[in-house]
């Protein structure tokens, strides 16, 4: 770089003014972020800042992923017939048309050992036709096939190999089979760091798996929300969910703290849905689905959709709630108000709208009020409030209140008039 001459004259007032204007122009966007702008403009600036942080971009996950995963209901008891019948059921029940597109095989799909060339071998008893044939079947239904591996020597079941030190080989295999999604778990790590192991697979995916959605399942142990956007399309922020109220609510709370890191192309993941597995009440499942939708969490069904009840189907197929999850603005809703288990969760949507959930985590009926000041609306703003579970609309101004049953919720979209 050339040095300035020591004999050069001081800058002119005009030059100083131009420099000040240039500096102000660079600072203005960040200063403006403190202003009271619309949800769209805030979201656009936020997405721009996030895009500059991201190095992983495969064009996938512009909205949170939707589909089905085998683990919560079947654990290791899976086979190719279940996967085929699940794909059929997603189509026949209308769930596929609502956006549930991924049919994801979890752990236990492969033989215990690799073949002589070091390749995965699909389990000969449970997947005798192989994964390629299964992918072809699922694709013919207009759906996508997902598969599972692990950033370790074995998967979490200890019944099949992991992908550690086989990353490129395995991604090439998955791509050759037509796999569309990879869930990548975190067991049997051989004492090697999370960053090393997930970076290796991310690099392999960038080179050989560009059309494969990459879901990191690190369990939130090392704050993946702060770094996984450089590596994949979603990242677990919590440990495994269980089919009970305490587990579901704690996962919601743990995930909430990382809201600023989610957005189009990369999402926080508080784990799969338990709706329909029988461990919670209808009200609790409705709350579960509503909070996951508001928080822009992946909507991955975890029950047996071949035999689900009408009650379960009604929850999973609420198109108005799904629309909140899939909104193009892509901003994760958050807990904005809490009073002894009576909570308000809210977030911005496209077209200046707001999504609001009134959530009663107490064991008694209670009235919950969301004040405009807590959800980013001026007090004078009048809205049309759409109740997403009652499928009815009404006018509101300044606040919205409802009597909410124990462990239940009310969910609204507010559209300024």
From Swiss-Prot:
Record-listed E.C. numbers: 3.2.1.22
Q: What does UniProt report on the pH dependence of this protein? A: Optimum pH is 5.0. Slowly inactivated above pH 8.0 and below pH 3.
InterPro entries in alphabetical order: Aldolase_TIM (IPR013785), Glyco_hydro_27 (IPR002241), Glyco_hydro_27/36_CS (IPR000111), Glyco_hydro_b (IPR013780), Glycoside_hydrolase_SF (IPR017853), Melibiase_C (IPR041233)
Cysteine pairs bridged by disulfides in the record: 76-108, 156-187
How is temperature linked to this protein's activity? Answer: Optimum temperature is 45 degrees Celsius with p-nitrophenyl-alpha-D-galactopyranoside as substrate.
GO biological process assignments: galactomannan catabolic process
So where's the catalytic machinery, residue-wise?
A: 185 (nucleophile), 240 (proton donor)
Which residues are involved in binding alpha-D-galactose?
71, 106-107, 156, 183, 185, 219, 236, 240
Q: Which SUPFAM superfamilies match?
A: (Trans)glycosidases (SSF51445), Glycosyl hydrolase domain (SSF51011)
Instruction: State the reactions this protein catalyses.
Output: Hydrolysis of terminal, non-reducing alpha-D-galactose residues in alpha-D-galactosides, including galactose oligosaccharides, galactomannans and galactolipids; melibiose + H2O = D-galactose + D-glucose; raffinose + H2O = sucrose + D-galactose; stachyose + H2O = raffinose + D-galactose
Quote the record's activity regulation.
Answer: 1 mM Hg(2+) and Ag(2+) decrease activity by 98% and 96%, respectively. 1 mM Para-chloromercuribenzoic acid (PCMB) completely inhibits enzymatic activity.
A GO CC term attached to the entry? plant-type cell wall
Keywords linked to the UniProt accession: Disulfide bond, Glycosidase, Hydrolase, Signal
GO MF: alpha-galactosidase activity; raffinose alpha-galactosidase activity
Per the UniProt entry, the signal peptide is 1-55
What family, per the record? Belongs to the glycosyl hydrolase 27 family.
Q: What does this protein do?
A: Hydrolyzes melibiose, raffinose and stachyose in the following decreasing order of reactivity: raffinose, melibiose, stachyose. Acts on both the terminal alpha-galactosyl residue and the side-chain alpha-galactosyl residue of the galactomanno-oligosaccharides.
Q: What is this protein called?
A: Alpha-galactosidase
Native organism = Oryza sativa subsp. japonica
